[in-house]
Amino acid sequence: MQDLDIRGARVHNLKNVDAHIPRYSLTVFTGLSGSGKSSLAFDTIYAEGQRRYIETFSSYARGFLGGGLERPDVDEISGLGPVISIEQKTTNRNPRSTVGTVTEIYDFFRLLYARAGTAISYLSGSPMVRYTEEQILELLLQRYEGKKVLLLAPVVKQRKGHYKELFEQLRKKSFLTVRVDGKLREITYGMKLDRYKIHSVEVQTDKLTISEKNHDRLLASLRLTLKEGDGVMMIQEHGTNKVAYFSRHLMDPETGLSYNEPAPHNFSFNSPNGSCPRCKGLGEVRVIDLDSIIPDRSKSIYAGGILPLGKYRRSLVFALIEALCDKYEASIKAPIAKLPEDLLTEIVEGSEEDIILHEDRFAELRGVPISYDGIAALLMAQREEEDTSRETEKWMTQFTRSEVCPECHGGRLNKEALHYFIGGKNIGEVASMELTHLATWLEGLEDKLTPQQRTIATEVLKEIRTRLSFLLDVGLGYLSMNRMSASLSGGESQRIRLATQIGTQLVEVLYILDEPSIGLHQRDNVRLIHSLQKLRDLGNTVIVVEHDKDMMLEADHIIDMGPKAGRLGGEIVFSGSPKEMMRAGTLTARYISGTETIEVPNERRPLTERQLRLTGARGNNLKGIDVTLPLGTMICVAGVSGSGKSTLINETLLPILSQHLYASLKEPLPYNQIKGLEHVDKVVAVDQSPIGRTPRSNPATYTGVFTDIRSLFVGLPESKMRGYKPGRFSFNVSGGRCDTCSGNGYKKIEMNFLPDVFAPCEACHGRRYNRETLEVRFKGKSIADVLDMTINAAVEFFAHVPQILKKLQVLQDVGLGYIKLGQSSTTLSGGESQRIKLASELAKRDTGKTVYILDEPTTGLHFEDIRVLLGILNRLVDRGNTIIIIEHNLDVLKSADYIIEIGPEGGKNGGQLLFAGTPEALTKVKDSPTAPFLAEELKIAARLKKKTR
């Protein structure tokens, strides 16, 4: 197979680029943000690979794609095989998607439990048994030799009904006797039971004395009984009430409890056969939150104290509540805090007794007993209605909270599925184990199995162990199989997909990855690099778009894009081995070789009395830690993946501040106390979630600069002459937009078995607007031309429009000068989305008492971009604000005033406060996973500082 060669690539800002990528190599694409790395890797190489794949479809299938995908602007690509792209975007938002289902490890466990699990009765705790006809016959002869018995076939088990038709059918089959609710009765014509009561019915198929002489009769009766009882039969000793059960299915011989034949779908929480009937396989249920329904107990019910009901009005529900108040001799106008607790319980949860109204306004109901189910039941019933609008559902959600399902206790499965055991654990317990602990448990599992189980399980366990080892290799041992995909970060999602790909053992494939080191501690980087090398060694070519220094030094080949970003980038400034790179003069090479670095501050900001003091934080894996956050400084929260950083900051501190400042409804995770809230008057969280989920949302709309641009176009003489309003230049409302694509610029093609494809609109060719709108121009450019500009180009274009320029310059300052104003949010990486949010916040006025919370802001940033970002953040801190950054990047850690490290490991072995203090002090901590890496980084910085003096 030949090497991969690209000639004349001109996609986006690429300047007729020629590139050579050795086959079976680990190649790193690096360079400044916006220099053209992704344009070459994803928009040229991957796009052409996808196009060639589509070309293999029949002409009929391609017809649904409007003739296929557009060819990237490139002269030639040779040596291109099948391409798989693994990007850093959060996976499925579906709550049913978990780490176990995405990696398919859970599917193998379902197979394992279905084929080798030991069934235990959830009623008696005894092992379930199943018999063949021969075994049942043998047991009957052993246990009941010489005894007179009744052979009974269960036909109804604990169900309501009169069963008139059933008795008639049995009578026609010549059966004479049935056992109804434990008593024998003769079947008579027209016989029926009380339809509103629960019954158990067994038909008597024979009455005989068990002996070897009656062998043939016993066998025939046994077969008839099993046939009528659908594989189940009962034996009752004549003259007693003692019964025993026998079954061809799994059955509890003590209670008669029967299980379905185990199959993989019985262990799936996405199947009605296996899911918990209460939570439908989600593991949690929504319950009414009393504090949300009654947020202010000083208010009366009359004044709107019950939030979902609002203020008093003449309605039936208020009349019923008034009647309840009368019953307790309480007033509807009294503060809720003064109402009897029993009355409040009845108002919310419902009354056991019917209520009788005596009011004139409900004359037709006067004297009629009315059942009252309570506010909680009213809300839940409304929430579950099929025609509930999204807005109504969102409004009602504020009155509920998620709780672990009381029936399956978070196991997601029904009782039956959770009572199959292997090695003493059910599948729910296995799914909730951290992957590192799961791997340890699997090590000695064969020793706990019977020879038959071992034979069945060997191949399945081999597959599970292989896939599990790949997840551990990419640093995800702190996750569990039941962790929801929606709760994963972009980096975690990407590494899961990487581990899954290694597990497929494909060869001759070109893999393209987008910054797989995101969210990974330096300590785990070695294992990630080893995984990528393993993928290469299988016989694949691996391209990684990456800024990580260690990744570059371990690569076989490096392509450095530059020299700058956007219009000033798009060239290959270096191509060769890491050794050759060390001698190159490019910006990246200077940072790699250590001739250039991000300087360590000359002095750390002093700590003042302005502090937030959080005590007893114990959410998720946190071990009741006490943390002090000095305000007016740059604080970094470090620690290995899964140690509890996000739990502490995003799920505990942020909700506390949001509740205090904005009365947010999101509950923080458990903690004891927080002091110092008076020093904060604003909190801003900047995370990596998308700025929008449709092609309509873009940087211009998110930051608000598009409103200013539209106002500018409305003020032009041509617009005034035509009477155009701001809506004319919006692609979200009809009038000025293209009606064919409704202003999307693309048409969405559903591929069913592939991700949806967006093809350019044939009417407007992706420009979103109709011809008349595009005729209005500012400095020769239409509104579509402006949206197609990069931020850098737009800064030059609007240099003399201060209101627009200010917002654009902030986007430029955070290293986003290369993206287009109208670039669809669906094409932005998590890091880019985060920086757009950061820019949007930076453009607003800060208070000097603002707390900014950033989650890995260096995602997607080159060393030089990080230097610029740190400059912006330091400016904010210099004005008295506080920056809290969750980060692994050593350049950021060494620039912090204060570092908090959580650890020492991920998951259950994390959650402890390892250190809090300056970066220099951290390097002296022996048990810190971060200390040795930070110490080395500070040494390099100090050495370089001496040289430059």
What are these regions (language model features)?
Residues 1-949:
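Conserved phosphate-binding elements of NTP-dependent enzyme cores
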